[in-house]
């Protein structure tokens, strides 16, 4: 080998050694960086995959994911193993950083770490305090009020036993330190971490409801000086657009605790200025960046660049300190100034931008995403990881990092970002911004000049330029011109209502009046609130079910225009592969890292010294990395490492060949939404979608101007049958109808009374042997047996030796009480004896008598605003207020009443008969017209010819089940029938009710003590399986042809006997037993414990009138209450003063003498038209020619009823007429008598949202809401009130002026009777007229014919309770009486009987004008008076009543959508409107829950004919079969011959009765007598008026049953499933005893429980007795109760006397002889020992309290206690079992 070769080899070997050394250094630094990353901060929300940026996983139920955090609702259940969040090295030396806001005032756990059923770490948020739990009984409490609706940034610094609470970013934050009582134990890695939810099972703990923006755990307690920089930027900016506190939270307190010094008073605003940071480019290229923080100094950017590993060369602690110092790289953000108001972005339809040339300006821009475009990657630090997402991976120092060229996909989410619009003129493609799963901090470039003008929205209203200092959202850049927002609000041209705007604190440092409204966004629109800050992503679009804090729900907006699809970006470069981590919670997926080279085996160390002798060595310096060793033996598989940081995104490889189809993989996670594709072709009509959630009611628009009358519409479809009214009075007896076909079986009737004893039947055949029944439940312990008879006396034994003195005997049984001895003399008082042992707790005594009323307590603190109370009684009419200012000109009034009849026109000439027109084409089938009125009895027609037999009709549908008929008379006893064939074995009867509890049995012998089994070996941890590849989705195959009908199967074998059926109906009441002998008098018992609250007592006598209270604040609107029952009839008013006597009037026509009635008060006379004179009979004219068919005339005015004309002669038979058109609907008639109130109708679907009204003028700034405003102006006239009491007689009216004699009109043609119109409102009181002149003598009128007797009217409804009278004047003071002797307090007397009515009092002053009385009966018709002179114009009257409907006008053109109106005040509850037309069929509802098992169904329809089988062998002769059922109804027969006309029918149904039934006017289609029976006529064709009451009764029962299921009452007949259901349905219930039925079966097995609503609706079961572990709940009900609950707890106390129960010393583990508690499923439970004093064997009663809290409710209640101590003569114990409460 020559020299050159030798040198080359030596040089090569040196180079290889250097490279190896460099590689070792790189590997060491990389591994060191990885270890540092693994032990860095823990972002809990990111580890739980709850960040909105992590779109790869759906969030759990009850969690609403936002870009700035999450919102936890009551249904949130987020759990994960502890080891997946916190590494094992994390001990009690860390900092917990939180940014939360509470939505509900309660005591809740934000998070908890559980080990089994013990809590190891948890934060409890209570009103006014925060409690950090570090184990059972180990907690630190801080006075801090978090329930004020604001965002709070907190930091808990835990250092051993010391816990310090900091409120970062405040000037006065010095921290409050508390000491834990005990050093907390290490976290169990096998424990469970829970976020939100009622997981801690502590008393009074409910799920946390609120928002969490940040939840980080930093493993260092020395980081409190940099906590403010650790708060996320978007969390700190949450304060700048915080919404108003919800209605569920109180206003912020004026007296905040000292720790809240940094918070602001309610009337101040909170502005935030982010800290400025220096962003220095690296290598001058801007490809990567290094971020540092300066304290208050803003250095200029420099071009110097540290090496890539500069952050790692400072030592071990450098990355940790950097993680705390350089958390929040941010852009320079300007402070909000007073001159630049905030931005209000409301939902809008994005306008299409128009690009125009021009310059870019840093105006406020809006894009559809917030996401940053990564332009740099940081080196070996966690810069921005808290603000954006996952941690960055340390870079290798061998290569400088270049700017990634990959362009992210467009983000379909429609959010908004604000910032400048930097452009790059070198690139032709515009990138669309989108947040990556792991975005990194970037440095935005300055906007460069370009040739494109910023895009502007079309709407230019309310344009106000924003500050030019606004920049992009931090960590984001943009390369596409974005639309510039130049307005403070987006307006919309779509006719939808925007969401209601809530008041928020104003954000203006100079107290300018610029409100910053808060909008409630809904998908898919975007809505943003901000105050000139660059990023606002607090609320993202989402759908929320209606909750108490529905702050984020608004009305749905319009669909936006289709966005342009983005261009695909170039492929990215290959990323750095990350290390393979353990299978943790789903996070950002990184690629597995390459395995590193195995190191050399180290040298053998020196032998160690024995323990205790070796001195503790100092910590050595970090050694240099050794040389690379040889490859060692393959080691064992190591434990799972911590999850590694995600690797850089790799460059997609080339398209590989298509592989074979793999096995079907698990369903993948939900992928990120792809880019918006081009607009596709119009698809086919889809199915009706699932109904969406009802939106909040929009603001009431202003009343529009009345439109022009529309054209007459077409006849609508027949409406659905209306709601059934109440049962009306019995009608007249109808004629017997045709006997119809037997109806279907009716509704199962109620259990009838026991009938008379029937005849003894023929004894049946002996039955087969029954199937052996199931094993019955073990019976209760029997009573102690009676003492046996004494045995025969044995022989007398020999006398034994004197024995040794025995031990003291056991105390003998207590003897019977002897006879009462004579009272002895009082002896000397003895010395006080020693205190005796503690007695047993006595049984619960009977409720004691109510104690005397205690002294009046001090006024309590003002409580939270309660729910809206029920509507109070109508107050007295207030005094007449001062005249208000003249109002604006009113709108055009409604159409007035029809005018008087015009003069009769001149009779026209007789027309010429027209020619018969050609036969028209057949018209369309018309709608079924409304039933016409009953016509007059027609004349008898000729007998028609026999018609051809019609074809057989189709089979009719099964009719409705008939109502059960009344029981007929008992029939004669039938002859004994032949013995029938043996019937099938009946179903086993239902299980009977549980019998009463038997007496206590004899105590059993103590069993032998069981041995504790050995602990089993721990199982091995399995290896995680490889995830299968996701196969390509196959194409959808063509739809197959329907298969051929298979042959019918053979008859199955006889099934085995079923399980016992449900419990049967209660048996009949047995005969009353003879009274037992009187027992001996018992001893007087001890005074019992205070009883449970008794039932509500009867209403006491009315108290004295109290002093007038102050005017209360206006209450919140309450829920709509149910209609109350009609009140009793008011007392009759006193007779009013006599009016002034008028002049004698003209003698009227003699009327028909009526019955002498009582003198009634004058009622309001209704409006009635004049009655015309009877005209002279004209001569009979010649019969005219037949005229052409005329058009349907207009509806005539209602004329007076004419006299009954003479019976005409029989006319010729007319030809069969065609079906006439439906008549026009009659006018609205007078209001009828009020009908009986109907049943409560079902709630109809919510109507569509109306078009927006015109925009109202912007209101002025309102006054402070706390200051009581002035008395409002008198409101508008309300709707017509209920019928009031009869008013007092009014003042006599003024005499009218003399009128001019009018001509008497001719009688008008009788018009069609119109429907009764609505009752008009009472007009204003007229002015008093002057005395009129005496009228002329009228002509003598003709005597009218006697009218037919009217139908007896229905009884009117019960009147409402009259108003309360005014308070009388105080009487004169009487003389002072003498002091009487003090009497002994008597017992409370019974309620006295109602006294006799007192004497009428002195007449009071003239009261206010009463409500209008009921409409009086029509008086005798008077003559028409003379028209008076027109009086002076009166004042502007109130708004008139609703006029008659005018003719329908032409359809107007569609108006422009109005502007958004201001929300009006809530209106008064209106009268029930007329029933609306039936709505369209709604979409198919969501599938409901599985219902209970139904009754045995009827036989199904016959199946298809099967294949003809082979001929079978002839069977044996069978028994005689039972009588077959009634066959199917045959085809409808041909119509029979026309019969003679029937007799006149009974009178029609009164109008009130028709309204009561709600069926409209029921008109009989035709009448027939009992002689006219048409064969084949079905039952359904008959009028069902006689069946309507029964149908109504059935519907009422079903309606009440459904209502009780939806709204349980908690009674025995209407039980709830759980107490939680009662708590959710009714907010006003109190703790007490209620009935529940967890399986929702028959209410007979419902159980009585205690409901604790104050702690969230707990269901508590009490044992039968407190001394035994027995509960009167069946296993089935208990299983359902377990399934419906989320946890349970129970408390058991063991009272002990000289016996050890748990441990032998305080605070010691349980001894081997400790008692064991067995759960409901047999497992041994470990209790929480609250107190144990049984180790004290001092001859006194002690006790041990055990508490069981479990997450699995199936473990409780405790059913058995084993290993109880043996009872000795000097030791005793007994149990006190508490109730078990289910959550």
Swiss-Prot record:
InterPro entries named among the record's database cross-references: Collagen, Collagen_Structural_Proteins, ConA-like_dom_sf, Fib_collagen_C, Laminin_G, TSPN-like_N
Cross-referenced PROSITE patterns: NC1_FIB
Tissue expression per record: Expressed dynamically in the notochord from late epiboly, spreading to the anterior notochord by 24 hpf, and then throughout the notochord by 30 hpf. Subsequently, notochordal expression becomes restricted to the distal tip of the tail by 48 hpf and is no longer detectable by 72 hpf. Also expressed throughout the floor plate and hypochord at 24 hpf, and in forming head cartilages and the first forming tooth.
Chain intervals for the UniProt region annotation (Disordered): 288-312, 327-524, 553-744, 772-1461, 1512-1546
Cysteine disulfide links: 1619-1651, 1660-1781, 1696-1734
SMART domains hit by this protein: COLFI, TSPN
Annotated positions binding Ca(2+): 1637, 1639, 1642, 1645
Signal peptide span: 1-35
Ranges where the record places region Triple-helical region: 553-1547
Segments of skewed composition (Basic and acidic residues): 1131-1158, 1170-1182, 1257-1267
Pfam family, one: Collagen
Domain Fibrillar collagen NC1: from-to ranges: 1589-1783
Compositionally biased tracts (Low complexity): 403-415, 622-633, 651-661, 735-744, 817-829, 861-870, 978-988, 1098-1129, 1334-1349, 1396-1409
Extent of Gly residues compositional bias: 926-935
Glycosylation sites: 1698
Residue spans crossing the bilayer: none
Localization, UniProt: Secreted, Extracellular space, Extracellular matrix
All copies of domain Collagen-like, residue ranges: 554-608, 818-873, 845-902, 986-1043, 1269-1326, 1446-1503, 1497-1549
Matching PANTHER family: COLLAGEN ALPHA-1(XXIII) CHAIN-LIKE ISOFORM X2 (PTHR37456:SF6), SI:CH211-266K2.1 (PTHR37456)
Task performed by this protein: May play a role during the calcification of cartilage and the transition of cartilage to bone. Together with col27a1b, plays a role in development of the notochord and axial skeleton.
Protein family membership: Belongs to the fibrillar collagen family.
Domains as described in the record: The C-terminal propeptide, also known as COLFI domain, have crucial roles in tissue growth and repair by controlling both the intracellular assembly of procollagen molecules and the extracellular assembly of collagen fibrils. It binds a calcium ion which is essential for its function.
Name of the protein described by the UniProt record: Collagen alpha-1(XXVII) chain A
Source organism of the structure: Danio rerio
Classification lineage: Eukaryota, Metazoa, Chordata, Craniata, Vertebrata
Gene name of this polypeptide: col27a1a
């Amino acid at each position: 080998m020559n020299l050159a070769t030798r040198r080359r080899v030596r040089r090569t070997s040196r180079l290889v050694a250097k490279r190896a050394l460099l590689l070792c250094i790189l590997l060491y630094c990389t591994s060191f960086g990885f270890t540092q990353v693994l032990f860095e901060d823990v972002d809990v929300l990111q580890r739980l995959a709850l960040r909105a940026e992590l779109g790869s996983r759906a969030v759990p139920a009850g969690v609403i994911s936002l870009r700035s955090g999450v919102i936890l609702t009551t249904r949130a259940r987020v759990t994960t193993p502890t080891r997946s969040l916190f590494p094992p090295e994390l001990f009690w030396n860390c900092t917990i950083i939180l940014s939360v806001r509470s939505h509900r005032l309660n005591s809740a756990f934000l998070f908890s770490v559980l080990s089994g059923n013990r809590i190891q770490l948890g934060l409890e948020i209570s009103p006014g305090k925060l409690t950090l739990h570090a184990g059972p009984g180990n907690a630190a409490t801080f006075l801090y009020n978090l329930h004020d609706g604001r965002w709070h940034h907190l930091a808990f610094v835990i250092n051993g036993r010391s816990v310090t609470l900091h409120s970062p970013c405040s000037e006065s934050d010095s921290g409050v330190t508390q000491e834990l009582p005990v050093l907390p134990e290490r976290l169990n890695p096998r424990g469970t971490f829970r976020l939100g939810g009622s997981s801690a099972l502590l008393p009074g703990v409910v799920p946390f409801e609120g928002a969490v923006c940040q939840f980080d755990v930093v493993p260092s307690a020395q980081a409190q000086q940099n906590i403010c920089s650790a708060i996320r930027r978007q969390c700190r900016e949450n304060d700048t657009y915080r919404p108003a506190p919800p209605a569920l939270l109180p206003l912020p307190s004026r007296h905040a605790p000292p720790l809240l010094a940094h918070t602001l008073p309610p009337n101040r605003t909170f502005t935030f200025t982010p800290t400025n940071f220096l962003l220095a480019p690296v290598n001058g290229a801007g490809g990567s960046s290094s971020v540092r923080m300066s304290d208050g100094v803003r250095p200029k950017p420099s071009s110097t660049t540290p090496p890539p590993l500069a952050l790692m060369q400072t030592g071990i602690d450098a990355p940790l300190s950097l993680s705390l110092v350089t958390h929040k790289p941010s852009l320079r953000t300007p402070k909000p100034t007073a001159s630049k108001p905030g931005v209000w972005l409301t939902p809008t339809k994005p306008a299409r931008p128009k690009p125009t040339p021009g310059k870019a300006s840093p105006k406020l821009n809006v894009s559809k995403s917030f996401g940053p475009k990564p332009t740099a990657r940081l080196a070996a630090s966690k810069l921005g990881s808290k603000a954006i997402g996952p941690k960055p991976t340390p870079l290798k120092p061998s290569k400088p990092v270049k700017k990634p060229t990959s362009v992210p996909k467009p983000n379909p989410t429609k959010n908004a970002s604000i910032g400048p619009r930097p452009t790059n003129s070198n690139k032709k493609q515009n990138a669309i911004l989108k947040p990556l799963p792991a975005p990194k901090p970037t440095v935005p470039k300055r906007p460069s000049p370009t040739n494109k003008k910023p895009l502007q929205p079309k709407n230019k209203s309310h344009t106000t330029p924003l500050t030019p200092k606004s920049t992009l959202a931090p960590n984001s850049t943009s390369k596409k011109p974005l639309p510039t927002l130049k307005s403070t609000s987006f307006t919309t041209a779509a006719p939808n209502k925007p969401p209601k705007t809530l008041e928020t604190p104003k954000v203006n440092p100079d107290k300018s009046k610029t409100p910053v409204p808060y909008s409630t966004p809904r998908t898919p629109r975007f809505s943003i609130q901000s105050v000139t800050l660059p990023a606002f992503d607090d609320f993202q679009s989402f759908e929320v079910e209606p909750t108490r804090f529905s702050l984020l729900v608004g009305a749905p907006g319009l669909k936006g225009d289709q966005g342009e699809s983005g261009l695909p970006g170039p492929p990215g470069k290959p990323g750095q592969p990350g290390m393979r981590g353990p299978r943790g919670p789903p996070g950002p997926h990184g690629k597995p890292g390459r395995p590193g080279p195995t190191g050399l085996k180290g040298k053998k160390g020196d032998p160690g010294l024995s323990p205790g002798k070796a001195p503790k060595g100092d910590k050595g310096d970090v050694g240099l990395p050794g040389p690379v060793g040889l490859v060692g033996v393959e080691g064992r598989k190591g434990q799972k490492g911590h999850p590694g940081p995600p690797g850089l995104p790799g460059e997609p490889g080339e398209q590989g060949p298509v592989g074979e189809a793999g096995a079907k993989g698990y369903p993948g996670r939900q992928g990120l939404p792809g880019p918006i594709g081009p607009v596709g072709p119009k698809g086919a009509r889809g199915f009706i979608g699932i109904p969406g959630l009802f939106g909040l009611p929009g603001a009431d628009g202003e009343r529009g101007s009345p439109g022009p009358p529309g054209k007459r519409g077409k006849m609508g479809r027949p409406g659905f049958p209306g709601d059934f009214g109440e049962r009306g009075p019995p009608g007249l007896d109808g004629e017997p109808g045709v006997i119809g076909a037997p109806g279907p079986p009716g509704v199962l009737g109620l259990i009838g009374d026991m009938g008379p004893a029937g005849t003894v039947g023929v004894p049946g055949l002996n039955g087969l042997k029954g199937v052996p029944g199931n094993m019955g439940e073990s019976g209760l312990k029997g009573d102690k047996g009676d003492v046996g008879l004494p045995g025969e006396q044995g022989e007398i034994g020999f006398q034994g030796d004197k024995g040794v003195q025995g031990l003291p005997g056991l105390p003998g049984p207590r003897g019977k009480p002897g006879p009462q001895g004579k009272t002895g003399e009082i002896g000397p008082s003895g010395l006080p004896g020693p205190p005796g042992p503690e007695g047993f707790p006595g049984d619960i005594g009977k409720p004691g008598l109510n104690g005397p009323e205690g002294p009046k307590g001090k006024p309590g603190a003002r409580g939270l605003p309660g729910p809206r109370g029920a509507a109070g009684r109508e107050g007295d009419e207030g005094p007449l207020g001062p005249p208000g200012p003249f109002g604006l000109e009113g709108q055009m009034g409604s159409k007035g009443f029809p005018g008087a009849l015009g003069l009769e026109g001149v009779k026209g000439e007789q027309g010429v008969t027209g020619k018969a027109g050609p036969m028209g084409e057949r018209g369309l089938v018309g709608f079924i017209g409304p039933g016409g009125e009953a016509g007059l009895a027609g004349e008898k027609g000729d007998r028609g010819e026999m018609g051809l037999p019609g074809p057989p009709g189709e089979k009719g549908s099964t009719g409705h089940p008939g109502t059960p008929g009344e029981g007929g008379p008992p029939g004669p006893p039938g002859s004994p029938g032949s013995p029938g064939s043996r019937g099938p074995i009946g179903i086993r009867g239902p299980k009977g009710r549980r019998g009463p509890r038997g007496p206590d049995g004899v105590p059993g012998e103590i069993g032998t003590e069981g041995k504790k089994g050995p602990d089993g070996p721990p199982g091995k941890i399995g290896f995680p399986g490889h995830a299968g590849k996701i196969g390509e989705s196959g194409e959808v195959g063509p739809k197959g042809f329907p298969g051929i009908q298979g042959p019918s199967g053979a008859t199955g074998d006889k099934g085995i006997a079923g399980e016992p059926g449900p419990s049967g109906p209660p048996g009949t009441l047995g005969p009353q037993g003879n009274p037992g002998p009187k027992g001996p008098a018992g001893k007087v018992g001890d005074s019992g414990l205070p009883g449970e609250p008794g039932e509500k007592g009867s209403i006491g006598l009315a108290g004295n009138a109290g002093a007038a209270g102050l005017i209360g604040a206006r209450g919140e609107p309450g829920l709509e209450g149910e209609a109350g029952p009609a009140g009793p009839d008011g007392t009759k008013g006193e007779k009013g003063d006599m009016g002034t006597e008028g002049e004698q009037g003209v003698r009227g026509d003699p009327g028909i003498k009526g019955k002498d009635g009582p003198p009634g008060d004058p009622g309001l006379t209704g409006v009635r038209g004049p009655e015309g004179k009877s005209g002279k009979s004209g001569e009979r004219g010649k019969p005219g020619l037949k005229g052409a068919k005329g058009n349907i005339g207009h509806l005539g005015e209602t004329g007076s009823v004419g006299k009954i004309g003479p019976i005409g002669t029989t006319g010729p038979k007319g030809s069969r007429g065609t079906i006439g058109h439906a008549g026009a609907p009659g006018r609205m008639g007078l209001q009828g008598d009020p009908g009986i109130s109907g049943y409560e109708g079902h709630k109809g679907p919510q109507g569509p949202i109306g078009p927006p009204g015109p925009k109202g003028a912007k209101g002025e700034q309102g006054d402070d809401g706390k200051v009581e405003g002035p008395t409002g102006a008198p409101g508008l006239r309300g709707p017509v009130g209920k019928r009031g009491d009869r008013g007092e007689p009014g003042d006599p009216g003024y005499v009218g002026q003399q009128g001019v004699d009018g001509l008497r009109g001719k009688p008008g043609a009788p018009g069609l009777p119109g429907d009764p119109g609505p009752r008009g409102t009472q007009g204003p009181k007229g002015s008093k007229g002057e005395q009129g002149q005496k009228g002329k003598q009228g002509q003598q009128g003709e005597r009218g014919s006697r009218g037919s007797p009217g139908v007896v009217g229905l009884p009117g409804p019960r009147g409402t309770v009259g108003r309360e009278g005014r308070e009388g004047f105080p009487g004169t003071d009487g003389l002072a009486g003498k002091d009487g002797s003090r009497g002994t307090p008597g017992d409370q007397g019974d309620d006295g009987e109602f006294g006799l009515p007192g004497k009428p009092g002195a007449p009071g002053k003239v009261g206010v004008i009463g409500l209008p009385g009921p409409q009086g009966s029509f008086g005798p018709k008077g003559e028409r008076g003379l028209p008076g002179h027109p009086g002076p114009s009166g004042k502007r009257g109130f708004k008139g009543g609703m006029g008659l409907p005018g003719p329908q006008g032409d359809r107007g053109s569609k108006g422009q959508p109005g502007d958004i109106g201001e929300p009006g005040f809530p209106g008064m509850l209106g009268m029930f409107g007329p029933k609306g037309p039936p709505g369209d069929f709604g979409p198919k509802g969501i599938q409901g829950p599985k219902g209970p098992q139904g009754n045995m169904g009827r036989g199904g329809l016959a199946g298809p004919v099967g294949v003809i089988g082979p001929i079978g062998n002839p069977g044996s002769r069978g028994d005689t079969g039972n009588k077959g059922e009634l066959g199917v109804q045959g085809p409808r027969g041909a119509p029979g011959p026309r019969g003679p006309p029937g007799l006149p029918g009974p009178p029609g149904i009164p109008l009130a009765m028709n309204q009561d039934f709600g069926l409209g006017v029921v008109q009989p289609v035709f009448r027939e007598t009992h002689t006219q029976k048409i064969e084949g006529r079905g039952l359904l064709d008959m009028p069902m008026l006689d069946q309507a009451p029964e149908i109504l009764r059935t519907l009422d029962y079903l309606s009440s049953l459904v209502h009780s299921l939806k709204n349980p009452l908690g009674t025995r007949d209407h039980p709830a499933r759980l107490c939680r259901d009662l708590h959710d349905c009714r907010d006003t219930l109190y703790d007490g005893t209620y009935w529940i039925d967890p399986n929702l079966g028959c209410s007979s097995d419902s159980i009585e429980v205690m409901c604790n609503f104050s702690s969230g609706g707990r269901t508590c079961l009490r044992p039968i007795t407190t001394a035994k572990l027995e509960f009167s709940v069946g296993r089935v009900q208990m299983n359902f109760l377990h399934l419906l609950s989320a946890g349970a707890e129970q408390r058991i106390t063991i009272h002990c006397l000289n016996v050890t129960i748990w441990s032998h010393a305080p605070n010691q583990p349980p001894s081997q002889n400790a008692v064991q508690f067995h759960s409901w499923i047999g497992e041994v439970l470990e209790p929480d020992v609250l107190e144990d004093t049984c180790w004290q064997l001092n001859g006194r009663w002690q006790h041990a309290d055990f508490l069981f809290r479990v997450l699995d409710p199936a473990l409780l209640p405790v059913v058995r206690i084993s290993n109880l101590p043996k009872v000795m003569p000097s030791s005793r114990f007994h149990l006190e079992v508490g109730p078990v409460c289910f959550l």
